Amino acid sequence: MAEQEQWQLQGSAAELYERYLVPAITVLWAADLVDRAAPQSGERVLDVACGTGVVARLAAERMGSGQVVGLDINTGMLAVARSLPTGAGPRIDWHEGSALEMPFPDATFDLVLCQLGLQFFPDRSSALREMFRVLVPDGRLALSVFSAIERTPAAKALVDALDRHLGPGASATKRSEHSLADADELYQLVAGAGFRQVTIHTTTQNIRFPSSKEYVRLQLAATPQAGLVSGMDAGHRDAIIAAIIGDVSSSLAIYSTGGELMFPQEAHVVLARK
């Protein structure tokens, strides 16, 4: 996987991600995933590609007691995760490491969670086999990935604008968020790693931003798309961003009421057992 296609954030970008994008998008999917996975008191839970830790924190709050571990390859994301307070429940242990070679013994966890991360792994099958390995017999897997980009109108509007104003291929990173959209492919990957009782639930969340302008601004500041414009001189950058905002705002006019943007976002949620 090319460097630009990896979900890599550092320093202030990770802080912006936690401050703005987690409340707007990620926490909705995190709550849905944790509800479906239903972690129980006393269980050992692993959150793979934990980012700034929203899934791990929600799981810990639900459990009350047990063990929760967050794993991510990104130092900046983990720094933010460690800096945030945890609520009720067990202390969360944060580990830096790859999902392709997890630093845990076999049969360590009762439940493995992975929210919106599998599509970014350079070897998805290896990552799933690692999840299988670290689960106890009959252990549970719960993961989510975005479906087709057309099922998230704001993302589709953004990639079209990026390619129009920054050249073909500028949207590759954003499009990669939706690169595991085929439910049949997803099923075969999970089953092929050894999991059984595999079910896929396709569901939708309504995502809100103060405006289309704010959606674009955050996408170009708190995600890997920031690299597309960060090296430009200020005048050129501002003109490009204004043009992208104009196109996205026009495309999303039907999703805007009183200036506020609200659009549907669809994802596949997978539940399975070892």
State each model region's role.
Residues 11-24:
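Class I SAM-dependent methyltransferase Rossmann-like catalytic core
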Residues 23-43, 58:
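Conserved alpha-helix/loop element of class I SAM-dependent methyltransferases that forms part
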Residues 3-7, 14, 52-54, 178-274:
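Conserved Class I S-adenosyl-L-methionine
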Residues 37-39, 62-63, 128, 135:
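A generic alpha-to-beta junction signature in SAM-dependent methyltransferases
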Residues 125, 132-211, 226:
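Conserved catalytic/acceptor-binding region of the Class I
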Residues 44-102, 111, 125-126:
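Class I SAM-dependent methyltransferase SAM/SAH-binding core
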Residues 46, 108-116, 267:
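Short SAM/SAH-binding signature in class I
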Residues 110-124, 147:
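A short SAM/SAH-binding and catalytic strip from SAM-dependent methyltransferases
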